[in-house]
Amino acid sequence: MPGKIAVEVAYALPEKQYLQRVSLQEGATVEEAIRASGLLELRTDIDLTKNKVGIYSRPTKLSDTVHDGDRVEIYRPLIADPKELRRQRAEKSANK
């Protein structure tokens, strides 16, 4: 018989951070942890078909299993391409 595990679900915005602790059955998935956290109802900007997720900064799939003590992270979409930003900064410093 599977036991209970404790997992944290995190979502960070520039102005506010959300950290929810949930208790799940062993064998639960990343998606189940996120749904149990209530963040999908609290933050309508989270779309699991678009937002990437991870466990302790390592990208993962919604179907991956969580383990006791894991921190599931929901990542915001990038608003700018990092390569493009680096190129623009390099051009700007070259023109000085």
UniProtKB/Swiss-Prot annotation:
Disulfide bonds: none annotated. It comes from the Bacteria. Belongs to the UPF0125 (RnfH) family. NCBIfam families: PRK01777.1. This is Protein RnfH. It comes from Escherichia fergusonii (strain ATCC 35469 / DSM 13698 / CCUG 18766 / IAM 14443 / JCM 21226 / LMG 7866 / NBRC 102419 / NCTC 12128 / CDC 0568-73). The gene is rnfH.
